[in-house]
Swiss-Prot record:
Cross-referenced InterPro entries: Ribosomal_uS11, Ribosomal_uS11_bac-type, Ribosomal_uS11_CS, Ribosomal_uS11_sf
Cellular component terms (Gene Ontology): chloroplast; ribonucleoprotein complex; ribosome
The UniProt record lists the keyword RNA-binding: yes
NCBIfam families in UniProt: PRK05309.1, uS11_bact
Main location: plastid
Subunit structure of this chain's protein: Part of the 30S ribosomal subunit.
GO molecular function: rRNA binding; structural constituent of ribosome
Pfam families for this protein: Ribosomal_S11
Stated name of the protein: Small ribosomal subunit protein uS11c
Stretch list, region Disordered: 1-22
Lineage: Eukaryota, Viridiplantae, Streptophyta, Embryophyta, Tracheophyta
Organism for this UniProt entry: Nicotiana tomentosiformis (Tobacco)
Record's subcellular location: Plastid, Chloroplast
Keywords: Chloroplast, Plastid, Ribonucleoprotein, Ribosomal protein, RNA-binding, rRNA-binding
């Protein structure tokens, strides 16, 4: 009969607080990915390491409400709340995607009190690359 393998605690149960100590981050990059279905906000330091993130889905919105401007605004507020506590004062903003949450997310970032060094649209545009999918007939 084989020996029973001791169960290693799962990731969900193993961590109560933050893994790393709260480090001071004076400058960072805020990435906003706004699709038609959801808005994802990721805050990184200048080297690209993720400090905080949030999305409309994790902010409590479900279904089609995740794509709304108000959901994007709430997601930005949740993501930025933690980095302001860590001392972030200046940030660059990278906005990607065609969604409704683009402008609302940018407005929420401006209202948060973080000084924006620049705002860049990094939406991927094909230079006539792959053939797009056929149009829907509803």
């Amino acid at each position: 009969m084989a020996k029973a393998i001791p169960k290693i605690s799962s990731r969900r149960n193993g961590r109560i607080g933050s893994r790393k100590g709260a480090r001071r981050i004076p400058k960072g990059v805020i990435h906003v990915q706004a699709s038609f279905n959801n808005t994802i906000v990721t805050v990184t330091d200048v080297r690209g390491r993720v400090v905080s993130w949030s999305s409309a889905g994790t902010s409590g919105f479900k279904g089609t409400r995740r794509g709304t401007p108000f959901a994007a605004q709430t997601a930005v507020a949740n993501a930025i709340r933690t980095v302001v506590d860590q001392g972030m004062q200046r940030a660059e903003v990278m906005i990607k995607g065609p969604g409704l949450g683009r402008d609302a997310a940018l407005r929420a970032i401006r209202r948060s009190g973080i000084l924006l060094t620049f705002v860049r649209d990094v939406t991927p545009m094909p230079h006539n690359g792959c053939r797009p999918p056929k149009k829907r007939r509803v």
